Amino acid sequence: MNVSVNIEHVTKEYRIYRNNKERLKDVIVPFHKNKTFYALNDLSLTAYEGDVIGLVGINGSGKSTLSNMIGGSLSPTEGDIKRDGDVSVIAINAGLNGQLTGIENIEFKMLCMGFTRKQIKKLTPEIIEFSELGEFIYQPVKKYSSGMRAKLGFSINITTNPDILVIDEALSVGDQTFAQKCLDKIFEYKEQGKTIFFVSHNMKQVREFCTKIAWIEAGKLKQFGELDDVLPEYEKFLNDFKKRSKGEQKKFRNDLDSSRFVVK
């Protein structure tokens, strides 16, 4: 089985500045130390053709950072990501321009993805039909609801037939019927042997479509393996976490995040 995505020791750091003075010092003072946040820390995993990998973890764990890196919109501070094939990222608002109409966004986004105008003209009716936006396709996207934006973004990306698909909470908004249609399309891609990364807090969807689970906690890969090996462990953790008081949940998050801040 061929490797489609190989992630090796990936780290993503963000320098934290309290004011512009600290930012300036970081530029002009050699070896100036400042607080640094590790969004991801030494994370490695390999995805093969046909893998549908669920990226799970509580909010702020690093799932979206990882999905953006796989998609290529973020670069790692350290480490390397190799991709074998075209990647398409589906996230709410991803790549959409609020000033443009829906149909203008289709052309703009597909031009950015390397499609010719002839290809775009051919695919546009299919995208509009899948989106179910009707006459709203001619309205500015800034007037769309979050569900409508998700429909447009999903329809563009799913119709371009990528080799690797990254879905980041794009099915968490919008109506249930459209979400099911999207899941049916994802299942088609799964049957075709495409590689899919699926970020969701909906454990029912994760269990139904994923073959493997990557559990991310505090920017690190806590567990990675087959669905039936990892998901029950994560669901047990999640149930225990939800039983805690808001204060206990906040303390748990703060304790995790404290390990992600260093001065360097």
Curated annotation (Swiss-Prot):
> Methyltransferase: is it a keyword of this entry?
no
> Which reaction equations make up its catalytic activity?
ATP + H2O + teichoic acidSide 1 = ADP + phosphate + teichoic acidSide 2
According to the lineage, what is the superkingdom?
Bacteria
State one Pfam family annotation. ABC_tran
Q: Where in the cell is it found?
A: Cell membrane
Ranges of residues in domain ABC transporter: 22-243
Q: Could you name the Gene Ontology cellular component terms for this entry?
A: plasma membrane
User: Predominant location of this chain?
Assistant: membrane
Q: Which UniProt keywords apply?
A: ATP-binding, Cell membrane, Membrane, Nucleotide-binding, Translocase, Transport
**Which one of the record's GO molecular function terms can you name?**
ABC-type teichoic acid transporter activity
Q: Give me the residues that bind ATP, please.
A: 57-64
Q: What is the topology of this protein in the membrane according to its UniProt annotation? A: Peripheral membrane protein
| NCBIfam families per record | PRK13546.1
Q: What is the role of the protein in this entry?
A: Part of the ABC transporter complex TagGH involved in teichoic acids export. Responsible for energy coupling to the transport system.
The record describes its quaternary structure and partners as:
The complex is composed of two ATP-binding proteins (TagH) and two transmembrane proteins (TagG).
Which family does the record assign? Belongs to the ABC transporter superfamily. Teichoic acids exporter (TC 3.A.1.104.1) family.
* Protein name, entry field: Teichoic acids export ATP-binding protein TagH
